[in-house]
Curated annotation (Swiss-Prot):
Location within or outside the cell: Cytoplasm, Cytoskeleton, Microtubule organizing center, Centrosome, Centriole
Protein name from the UniProt record: Centrosomal protein of 135 kDa
Domain observations: Coiled-coil domains are critical for microtubule binding via the formation of a two-stranded coiled-coil structure in homodimers.
Designated gene of the protein: CEP135
Modified residues (Phosphoserine): 383, 439, 688, 1130
Stretch list, region Disordered: 1114-1140
Annotated region described as Homodimerization, given as residue ranges: 11-64
Coiled coil regions in record: 75-151, 199-416, 447-644, 668-1036, 1079-1113
Originating species: Homo sapiens
Amino acid sequence: MTTAVERKYINIRKRLDQLGYRQTLTVECLPLVEKLFSDLVHTTESLRQSKLSAVKAEKESANFDFVLEPYKLENARLSRENNELYLELMKLREHSDQHVKELKTSLKKCARETADLKFLNNQYAHKLKLLEKESKAKNERIQQLQEKNLHAVVQTPGGKKRSIAFRRQRMQIDEPVPPSEVSSYPVPQPDDPYIADLLQVADNRIQELQQEVHQLQEKLAMMESGVRDYSKQIELREREIERLSVALDGGRSPDVLSLESRNKTNEKLIAHLNIQVDFLQQANKDLEKRIRELMETKETVTSEVVNLSNKNEKLCQELTEIDQLAQQLERHKEEVLETADKELGEAKKEIKRKLSEMQDLEETMAKLQLELNLCQKEKERLSDELLVKSDLETVVHQLEQEKQRLSKKVESFAVTERQLTLEVERMRLEHGIKRRDRSPSRLDTFLKGIEEERDYYKKELERLQHIIQRRSCSTSYSAREKSSIFRTPEKGDYNSEIHQITRERDELQRMLERFEKYMEDIQSNVKLLTAERDKLSVLYNEAQEELSALRKESTQTTAPHNIVSLMEKEKELALSDLRRIMAEKEALREKLEHIEEVSLFGKSELEKTIEHLTCVNHQLESEKYELKSKVLIMKETIESLENKLKVQAQKFSHVAGDSSHQKTEVNSLRIVNEQLQRSVDDYQHRLSIKRGELESAQAQIKILEEKIDELNLKMTSQDEEAHVMKKTIGVIDKEKDFLQETVDEKTEKIANLQENLANKEKAVAQMKIMISECESSVNQLKETLVNRDREINSLRRQLDAAHKELDEVGRSREIAFKENRRLQDDLATMARENQEISLELEAAVQEKEEMKSRVHKYITEVSRWESLMAAKEKENQDLLDRFQMLHNRAEDWEVKAHQAEGESSSVRLELLSIDTERRHLRERVELLEKEIQEHINAHHAYESQISSMAKAMSRLEEELRHQEDEKATVLNDLSSLRELCIKLDSGKDIMTQQLNSKNLEFERVVVELENVKSESDLLKKQLSNERHTVKNLESLLATNRDKEFHSHLTSHEKDTEIQLLKEKLTLSESKLTSQSRENTMLRAKVAQLQTDYDALKRQISTERYERERAIQEMRRHGLATPPLSSTLRSPSHSPEHRNV
């Protein structure tokens, strides 16, 4: 038993030593250790078997994964394609929705435009209908008036009443009445540039802020529409995600689903972040623009604030300086009095100088008044001459009318003589000797009529001679002028001379108006100088009164002697104050010197302005001399015209002597007739030239001629009436020639009138130039007046400031006197100074009395000048009214300036609010920039992680290869070990120790292998996850690129569509413009056709009227007419035949 126990103990001890258990082993715990050791061996064997089964299961699972892998790939490809197709469908839907919206907006615009065009078309059609109705009514009215004005009844010398047609009375107006040359003078308006600039700045700022508000509102509307679109897109995407999640839930592993959900969430986050990045970039751009604008406004505001602060500092400095000046003026009143006396002396000198200038101006005014009187006398003389000339013109026109009527009568007489001779010969041929005793009676009546008319014209000529002789007795000048006018052979000379005289008259009137304006300007200047003189006199009196009051106050400031004993202790303090006062006195002297320099500078400026006014006066005098020279030239021209009139009067006397004989009259009329025939030939030549201009109206004339031809064809069916119409047509041709002559005369008259118009237009242009020069001079004078007013206002302000300073000086003086009562030594010195001041006051009183005497003399002179200027105050009252109006306007402008200041304060408050908003926006921008920077950093971190993971993947793949190689080697070793174990089972007892050690080593290696396998599994999982993430990232990149590409394509397509729409708009606008142009062209054509139609109607009516008049004149003169021809052809019905 002991040997068996010992053997067991030795075996167990060895095994424990082999396994590394070195602890002590007692005999009592030997059975327990045996059991534990047997259990350990059992567990190791079971572990070995489980590992083998696990290896087999892994091999089977690897085979299963290899079989399922192509199905997984195919399923993933199909799902990806499905997702891409669905994304494209969504994009197409969005694009179609946007396109539909744009088409709807364009359709609405087109509908509005079509509605507007329809409305305009209806309006134009309605207007055309109204115009057509009005034209029809007017045409009917014209026809009615023409029918009313066609016929009239005239009693012929034979006692019969015949109806003749009168020409329609016409009134040809070449041009409207010329406008009045003298327009209302522009009222000068004072312009304050500071107020205008502030108002303009405020208005501009308000407009800019309103524009910014509108732009922000538009951007907000755009952003809201974009948010709506994006919300719709997000809803569609979420629906798609839900659909895909439902589709992919069945038969998928939870890991894959979780990974896909993570990828989807990551994609959503990335898309959302991209959208936020884009939105934030756009917001950054807008905010940068806004910040720039606000910075600019801030700079402007800061500049304004700096300017205002500088102004405030300057004002503070000026206030301190004014305080110092007040103190110095208080302590040094004597020097102030001396400077005031000096200024008064200078003011006296200026008053004397201005009085001398006023005297010079009055002398010039007197000279100009004399010249005005002379010019008015010349004007009256010229007006009388113009009246005489107008009478002569009327006489000349009457003579020309009589001459034309006589020429017409002579032509009608010649025609009637020819017709009578023809009738006599025809009567002789038809009726023989029986008709002889009838024709002489007609000739006798005709000759008697001619003699009566001759006697009538003789009487008219004698009456005209009697009128001319009577007017020649009244004034020799008018008689000469009349005779010269009667002797002028042509009307063109009369018109040219009359137009020259009228032109000269107009020029003289303009010269007089200029002189009157110049006199008014001089009077206004004199009035201004008198006003300034009165103001200076008032200021001088006020200054003297203030000086006397100051001196009285200085005499009354003697302190009582009782206070002297109480003030001895304060002597030292008073001495220190005196020293300080002396220092301030020196500073005050320097200030006074500076003020005197400023006053001298202002005086020099005033002297410069006076020199400028003297230069203006010299220029006006030079203009006056030029006008005098022009008047002399006009007189010379008038004398030359009088000589011409004398020569023409002599010629007219010769003509009047020759006109007593009737034969000479007939010869002269024949010569005139020949001249008229020559002029008719010339006018026919001119008409042939002008017929080229009437080609546009020939189409309608041809239509009328065709109608006339048709009527002629109808008339040819009647042979008897055809011969009569031929004769009448010959007569009408003759009258047509006569009318052509009259037309040519009218064209000559029109040419003369056009020349006169051109001359008048030239004269009007010269007058306009002169008026513009006068207006410029008036504006300059107004500017000088405004400058003077500003200078007067500045002087008033300075006087107010001086009064305020004097008041402050008085107050500070009272305080100083109270302090001086406490002083003792100063009282003695002040007593001495008071004595000296009393002496100076006596001298000042004497000077005041002298000044009073001078003032009385000055008042007498002023009263004399006021008596002289009393007559001119009525003329200057209008200028005072204008000045009051200007003053009221200035007050209104001041009120507006205050309003503008209030508005500027409100604008400043708005700017402050805008600054606060800008600060908030800046803070927000900074926060957004920080978020963007964080996103960018995260993006970089993701990229760095991806790169590190790729490197780790490559490293792990290499390690896996090494481990697989090691695994293969280990498996080979295991197989060799198994073979050795099988071989060594027989020698189990011998190799137990070796087997135990090897088993332990094997177990250790197995543990390490399991660890390696678990690590490899984990690495595989990590690799698969990383590959999946890489694929997801690549798909995200691809989708982002596709999105960008599609967005680029959509933007390009939108741009092309916008360009197409713009081209369509331009085409529609061009069509509208072309249609409007065509409408205007058609209207112009309609107007031209209407005018042509009216002209042709007038021509037809005149031709009808002339034909009827010719027929009636032929009937009146007894020519062969259609009814006469019928009487001649049928002698049995005539009364003469009955007598036979």
